[in-house]
Amino acid sequence: MGEAVTANEGLSAALSATVDSEAREFIRLQLRAFNDLHSEYHRAIRSVEPTPLDILIRNAAGEIVGGLIASTYWGWLEVNILWVAEGLRRLGHGRTLLRMAEAEARTRGCAHVMLTTYSFQARGFYEKKGYRVVGEMAGYPPGVVYYWMRKDL
């Protein structure tokens, strides 16, 4: 680890198992500049942060027993997390969270929703709500399938 490998034209590549924060930030900014040059949407998102869209379900004691964490940008709703407490599952709370998020996304001008789920999570639930698989990666982690899903609003 960390040993330089000589390449053509006087360049070298070095592998490291330690974080070089300055180098990582430089590389991130270089890719951002490239993206901004080629995509008006990437440029636009830099001027406005994605708008959070969070919905919480609380019990009578005020404890969180379910929720959806998402954001809207580029005309999309991105659902990052949807969770309902074990004893409250299969009672329609997940459906309510999705419906509320989709309705708010429409008011924000969104036309699509995207989310990810694992094979041990909720693919069937999302499919029943009109979502479809647009990509999958088997073996991530081993023995599991990771799905990308979308829905047009």
What are these regions (language model features)?
Residues 1-21:
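Conserved N-terminal entry element of GNAT/NAT acetyltransferase domains
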Residues 27, 126, 131:
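Conserved active-site tyrosine of GNAT-family acetyltransferases
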Residues 28-61:
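Active-site rim helix/loop that mediates acceptor-substrate recognition in acyltransferases
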Residues 46, 59-60, 65-76:
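A conserved beta-strand-loop-helix scaffold within acyl/acetyltransferase catalytic domains
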Residues 71-80, 89, 141-145:
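A conserved beta-turn-beta hairpin within the catalytic core of GNAT-like acetyltransferases
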Residues 90-103, 128:
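Conserved acetyl-CoA-binding loop-helix of GNAT-fold acetyltransferases
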Residues 105-119:
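Conserved GNAT acetyl-CoA-binding A-motif
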Residues 114-116, 132-150:
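Conserved catalytic-core motifs of GNAT/GCN5-like acyltransferases
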